[in-house]
Amino acid sequence: MEKREAFIQAVSKELVEEFLQFLQLDKDSSNPFSLSELLDELSRKQKEELWQRLKDLLTETLLESPVDRWQTVEVEGADDMESEHSPKMRKSIKIICAIVTVILASVSIINEHENYGALLECAVILNGILYALPESEQKLQNSIQDLCVKWWERGLPAKEDMGKTAFIMLLRRSLETKSGADVCRLWRIHQALYCFDYDWEESREIKDMLLECFINVNYIKKEEGRRFLSFLFSWNVDFIKMIHETIKNQLAGLQKSLMVHIAEIYFRAWKKASGKMLETIEYDCIQDFMFHGIHLLRRSPVHSKVREVLSYFHQQKVRQGVEEMLYRLYKPILWRGLKARNSEVRSNAALLFVEAFPIRDPNFTATEMDNEIQKQFEELYNLIEDPYPRVRSTGILGVCKISSKYWEMMPPNILVDFLKKVTGELAFDISSADVRCSVFKCLPIILDNKLSHPLLEQLLPTLRYSLHDNSEKVRVAFVDLLLKIKAVRAAKFWKICPMEDILVRLEMDSRPVSRRLVSLIFNSFLPVNQPEEVWCERCVTLIQMNRAAARRFYQYAHEHTASTNIAKLIHVIRHCLNACIQRTLREGSEAHKECEKENASVLDKTLSVNDTASMAGLLEIIVILWKNIHRSLENNKEAKIYTINKFAAVLPEYLKVFKDERCKIPLFMLMSFLPASAVPVFSCGVISVLRNQESVTGRSYCTLLDCLCSWGQVGHVLELIVDWLPTVPPQAKSNLASKRKVEINDTCSVKPELALLYMEYLLTHPKNRECLLSVPQKKLNQLLKALEGSKAELESFLQSPSGNPLNFNKATALHAFGLYCRMSVHLQYKFCSEEKIHLSILDDTGSWLENKVLPLLEDQEEEYLKLRKDVYQQIIQTYLAVCKDVVMVGLGDPKFQMQLLQRSFGIMKTVKGFFYVSLLLGILKEIAGNTIIHKTDSDEKVTVLFDLVQEVFQKMLECIACIFRKQPEESLPLFHSVQTPLHEFITTIQSWHKDTAVHHAVLSTLIAAPVVEISHQLQKVSDIEELTSPQCLHDLPPFSRCLVGVIMKSSDVVRSFVDELKACVTSGDVEGIVCLTAVLHIILVINKGKHISAKVKEVATAVYRKLKTFMEITLEEDSLERFLYESSMRTLGEFLNP
């Protein structure tokens, strides 16, 4: 009793410290004092006295320290921490916090019979000061907000004002902090929204914040947030329209995964709405989504999101009222969309129709319902007969989904008609691979309904030849269908598509198809649940059916079973081979023959050592399987040692028995899997076999080189290669010195062709190249020096009148030069000690080309060049190809690239033809797309580099144009070979350097070339009456036709080209009637292409204005320019005003 009285008395100005002490004790969990318990124990009179004292203390505190001064004190306190007002303010805040704490606890115990007027006054005062509190007093703000929320929830007097305050504060805080707890608290007082009049000016801020909630992910993802958002639809009819516009405007930026939540918000709002609000949600929101779902372009980022929203409503058809609503809202737009002239509108409408089927009103009579469904079946049939492939594909999806879902309810004749149309006609639609693909992607939907299996079992065999479709995606879809048939046991897949056809496709098809085919037939040829002997029998059967298909099958087999099973199969095949060998050795013994007849297996009857194809096939399968589980064996040392020992024991015998070349290659590959010590006899003789080869008739040398590389003996091969390459003997220093020396002639034969083949193989395969480059640098330098001799040989050939090399023949010298260039790059990359790779050897080769080769070709007669054409062309191609690869992998710095571009000027100046153009365009493309250079080098260096890129491109087009002028017909097919690299270069410039100097320069060059050619053609016309405007690309001159054709491949390039064309016309870079007419011809052709730019008319307008300045020519006598002027103005008039 004394404590209650003491607490009440402490609520005063004089004993305020005791009051604060009580509140501190309440916070201390170790102290028995509890504020809530104390308040529960107070009598009615004590409560009223306490509340009156709280009001008095609050009033006195605020009078002594008004809230409006707190902001000023806070600002001053930042500059002067010793301000005398600051401690006073902090004390006042502490007292008010304590008062709010007691009031919050009191709200829970208020009884309606008690006089809580003083408490109400306190709440109103605190509500009034809330907005004036400084930002730093977050704790006090939160406490007053909690009071407002609690006051609203209790429904006490003045709850409207308290609720409005709490609503605004929580709404603002939830948007600022993005806290889920604030969203939940806001939902608790959501009814407070009705306290705000929608039309009041004060509600404008509320509207903005509420609309912001609809694009706030925190609200959309949280259940309470979605409830709150759907509730907002009930505030005002006009606000519904604002909500819908906000969501529509933000759809592009929202994740697709959020669309189901957005749809749920609309659906909840629709379920709870009535009257005018329901009508607004249906016709202004849901039907608006339907309209845009039909009319939006498929490539629009919003289209798929709109469809997600509509899909949610389609899925809710079982809910009361949804089906009727969908029928009513779709009726005025969907059927019209299905018959629209625009094919994309029809396609979009078809998607919605298929997803929403059946669209009906549950209130229909039975007759009305039957008529409506029949009408929709007819619409579905129209879809699969539509002339537009995408609509037909959607129709196929509809047929399959509807048939699967409503199989029992659909009339049998309609089902048969639909499926015959799909499997008998659309599966063989020659006009569209997408339609054929849709058939096989959608038929598995029907297979999910078991009732469809008997009918499909009759129809599907007609599709067997689809496995050989010329479109990969169709073949993939067809095999997926076979896998589905196998999974659901609808039919035997080999009755639909014979095993022979499957193996043929497995042999030749791409990885996506082959992997699926292996999955399809895996259990047939590797039945892991049967004895291991059966595995081997099936393996032999597969090899004998199709050896190449067997290789592909076992290449992917490890993806469908454990590595232990693959290892078992390897040893089962080894046992099989051993048994065949042993049976051959025992063939002379009659006793053994009788015994074998009794215990003969299937393999004993079908397999023999003399069956070379089967033996080679089994050995190949072992190699493939071993490669597949190589990593697993590395992790299982015991299994690896066991396998190595077993094969080390039998491989020498295999080499004796299997002498055919087809068997030798897999045997050598198996040897490479073993350490050299495991097969000492063979490993010691490999280098001798390679040395004794005279000519290369097969590929056995490749596997022998693999063996040496895997054994770490590549150094022996390197020595052999160097020995076989011819060397230029050093010049004698003096006659005296030569007399004192004894000459020893090395009789080792020189085999440069074979040496280069070995070298090519080592350098081409990554693992072997790694072994080669691990050899000491000194030996590699010797090899490089030997290869460098090819330069002297090639130079000699170009110089000598007879055209015969000294040591190499022509082909060998060129081969050696190519290997020299490639090897020099690998060596410098391997042994460079600095951060950057200095390609000095390749740079020296470029200098040699520039200073030695090209001068030999300058000013030479045609006959001289023709004799050496293949040599100098291949030298240049080899050098440019290696340089292109260097730039592509990022080894060439800007200095190297600039030197390369400078040398290209010399090449273009000296030689003629197209042979270097593709490579040079590739180099320009790689330089333009090398973003690393752009980031790491100075702007000045990059500017110089790209100036060179543009200059080289311009010079190259000039050279090509010159060739076209001299030999137009011969040049046309040659130019087609460079169209792809030209397109790649232009698109790279467009992608990486749009609106930069190099971009504008390249476009200007592309404009100048056709303008000059077309102008030249116009000026050469003898009969001006024959002049007509071009109707298509083929009406342009040859070079212009090729260039404009390349430009028209990309819509982005077309837009930039047209912009640059307009700039050239406007600035006067293109002037004169003839040149302006050439521009007109270009834009007429572009306007006929598939990427039509709206800016073409802007160019036409610019040309029209320029031509009007030449109006006085109509006063002159008839001339070419007057005719061109009049015809161009006439054409422009028709073009601009159709």
Curated annotation (Swiss-Prot):
InterPro entries attached to this UniProt entry: ARM-like (IPR011989), ARM-type_fold (IPR016024), Condensin2_G2 (IPR024741)
One Pfam family named in its UniProt record: Condensin2nSMC
SUPFAM superfamilies reported in the protein's UniProt record: ARM repeat
Keyword Cell division: yes
HEAT repeat boundaries on the chain: 459-497
Main location: nucleus
Modified sites of kind Phosphothreonine: 1114
Subunit structure as annotated in this protein's UniProt entry: Component of the condensin-2 complex, which contains the SMC2 and SMC4 heterodimer, and 3 non SMC subunits that probably regulate the complex: NCAPH2, NCAPD3 and NCAPG2.
Biological role stated in the UniProt entry: Regulatory subunit of the condensin-2 complex, a complex which establishes mitotic chromosome architecture and is involved in physical rigidity of the chromatid axis. Is required for early embryonic development and is essential for viability and expansion of the inner cell mass (ICM) of the implanting blastocyst.
Official protein name in the record: Condensin-2 complex subunit G2
Gene coding for it: Ncapg2
